[in-house]
Amino acid sequence: FRSDPQRDFLVDYVRTGAWGQTVSARSQWHKKTSWKRAAPTNEREKEINWRLDKNLSTGLIGEIGIHQLDAKSWFLGKRPQAITGIGSTVLWKDGRSEPDTVQINLEYEGGIHAGFDITLCNSFDTDYEMYYGTDAALMVRGSQAWMFKEADAPMLGWEVYAKKDTFFKEVGIYLVANATKLTTVTGSGEEDAKDNPYNDTPLYYALENFVHNAYVHQSGVEDFIAGFGDE
């Protein structure tokens, strides 16, 4: 996620304090799939399904959820002080030792809590992230994002002209690196997604940066220090 230009843009937006005081955050990754691969022999099946073995795998949190968890700390600008979690095998009772459903809670300084739910048993609402502040909430889905302002939130000015989408009874202000300020009210985030220059997946940008850093080593080191620090 840190390689995605759209998320880099969102971090700058978040750091301006546009959502007010941080309250909480939550995210999910839902996909109904066994996570199991077929193989011609039992021996080969065990090898290629290493993700289901707790002795070899970091499980759903480590193999998939780690990216959303990292995004939370990145956006909040904090490291968690405590983490609690629970998991169980609800559907795929096929001998695996890794759970198919996990919930965890991260506690940050100031009493801020961030929850994360991940399951292989249901696909509803797929994956997304929510961040809640005293003035607005931020929803991130893939390469798109929306801000939902509170009625008593101060005016930022540009949001009057920004494009908007309706979600049930809420109106989200469309946030994207090339179309946030001084854009027309007509249209929607979904319509503009195809024109978004940053519409590739985070994996695409991560691989692109990897190839670049393989040739320009020093800039890669500098980027890492800028993002993660030199400790």
Predicted feature residues:
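C-terminal helical cap and adjacent loop that interface with cofactors, partners, or active-site loops
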Residues: E63-P80, T84, D94, T101, ...
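Short beta-strand or tight-loop elements
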Residues: D100-V102, I112
